[in-house]
């Protein structure tokens, strides 16, 4: 299912995450990741990356994703970091698999990086970037 606009991809990703992944409590297309902190559970925040390219039949653009959860709890800090990293990696893997199986995403592997406690609210998890193809509209 090749898309024709960036806006279409962004909106579809939000719908997919909200309807098919109940473990994701908050989804937002935003630059700042500390929105929706009143929600408990895993959050998916994504934004447009700086890279795009024009090709012969399709164009390419990238979205940066962060799958995050709170690290600051009453649990042992090391155990919580391990739990959050494991959970967010598992959810991200399923999410990327769904996008690939349904034609949104086309590459065979995705590099995933660990997000340490980098936000003031103690959010951590995993981050990854996906490239998407856009069909060119045919102008005659």
Annotate each PLM feature.
Residues 57-72, 124-136:
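Oligomerization/assembly interface segments of phage tail-like spikes and tubes
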Residues 1-55, 107:
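Small/polar-rich, solvent-exposed N-terminal microdomains that initiate assembly or binding
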Residues 50-52, 70-73:
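Short, charged/polar surface micro-motifs in flexible loops or helix N-caps
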Residues 51-54, 111-121:
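Catalytic micro-motifs at enzyme active sites that drive phosphoryl/nucleotidyl and oxygen chemistry
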Residues 139:
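A helicase ATPase "motif cassette" and its flanking acidic/Ser/Thr-rich regulatory loops
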Residues 82-106:
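Short, hydrophobic/π-rich interface segment
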Residues 3-7, 82, 86, 120:
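Charge-dense, low-complexity intrinsically disordered segments
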Residues 75-79:
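Short acidic, glycine/proline-rich loop/turn micro-motifs
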């Amino acid at each position: 299912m090749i898309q024709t606009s960036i806006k279409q991809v962004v909106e579809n990703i939000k719908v997919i995450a909200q309807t098919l992944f109940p473990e994701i409590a908050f989804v937002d297309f935003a630059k700042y990741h500390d929105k929706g902190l009143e929600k408990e559970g895993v959050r998916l925040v994504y934004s447009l990356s700086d890279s795009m390219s024009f090709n012969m039949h399709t164009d390419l653009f990238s979205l940066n994703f962060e799958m995050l959860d709170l690290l600051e709890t009453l649990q042992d800090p090391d155990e919580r970091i391990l739990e959050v990293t494991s959970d967010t990696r598992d959810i991200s893997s399923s999410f990327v698999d769904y996008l690939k199986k349904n034609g949104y995403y086309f590459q065979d592997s995705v590099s995933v990086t660990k997000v340490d406690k980098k936000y003031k609210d103690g959010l951590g998890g995993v981050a990854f970037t996906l490239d998407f193809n856009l069909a060119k509209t045919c102008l005659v």
